[in-house]
Amino acid sequence: MGWKMASPTDGTDLEASLLSFEKLDRASPDLWPEQLPGVAEFAASFKSPITSSPPKWMAEIERDDIDMLKELGSLTTANLMEKVRGLQNLAYQLGLDESREMTRGKFLNILEKPKK
């Protein structure tokens, strides 16, 4: 079974061979019935998230947060990875500082429960 490449001169023949003269006698809902009957009505009964009020988490976002998201979105992959590395290093350093302070508190006996 050999395949023949179409040459530029027989492009009209190729185009003609792709035409379909099939008549669609029904409306599209009849052609493509719902997979689960009633789902479309159920989904339509809820308000669109676009028209309803913003979610609670969105209402709590401040202008600085939006600016930070825009800044992060504009970073290249390499710059974003560098930013993530910096945050990981900062988190590690904070963990070390917390550990030092907890050890210090233990030695100073400020973390013991008061005796009754």
UniProtKB/Swiss-Prot annotation:
Modified residues (Phosphoserine): S28, S53
Family classification: Belongs to the lin-52 family.
Presence of keyword Magnesium: no
Gene Ontology CC: one annotated term: nucleoplasm
Name of the protein this chain belongs to: Protein lin-52 homolog
Species this chain originates from: Homo sapiens (Human)
Matches recorded under Pfam families: LIN52
UniProt keyword terms in alphabetical order: Phosphoprotein
InterPro entries named in the record: DREAM_LIN52 (IPR018737)
Subunit structure as annotated in this protein's UniProt entry: Component of the DREAM complex (also named LINC complex) at least composed of E2F4, E2F5, LIN9, LIN37, LIN52, LIN54, MYBL1, MYBL2, RBL1, RBL2, RBBP4, TFDP1 and TFDP2. The complex exists in quiescent cells where it represses cell cycle-dependent genes. It dissociates in S phase when LIN9, LIN37, LIN52 and LIN54 form a subcomplex that binds to MYBL2.
One of the GO BP terms on file: regulation of DNA-templated transcription
Domain of life (superkingdom): Eukaryota
